[in-house]
Amino acid sequence: MVSAMAAPDPDILLLLAPDFTDAEGRRCYCPACATVEGLLGYYPALRQALTIRYIGFARPRAEVVALIGAANQGLPALVLADATPVELLADLAVRTGNGRRFLQGPASIGRYLARRYGSGEPH
């Protein structure tokens, strides 16, 4: 079951802010980020368990660069708490940037959240 209490060193979920304007001036949204938003809607307690940051579309994305490096600006990303047990990461594509472990993409993020917080797992 998802705990409503945030950990002292919480995982940090980075999502593109919804309804952004791209370089051509079109209103857009990120489908992968929308999938993760849907997961947060299904399991609202995840919002209390995670630190969630909405990032603007334009690059460079300073907050993302500071956390996981310039080469890793694709979102969604979940920056893992330093104390994350390695057994929760089995078979997930864990990446490293700026000394931090992170996951990218809704499927990996969803599987991790299920293991860590007890939400449903992607099927």
Predicted regions and their residues:
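GST-like domain detector, emphasizing the conserved glutathione-binding G-site
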Residues: 2-123
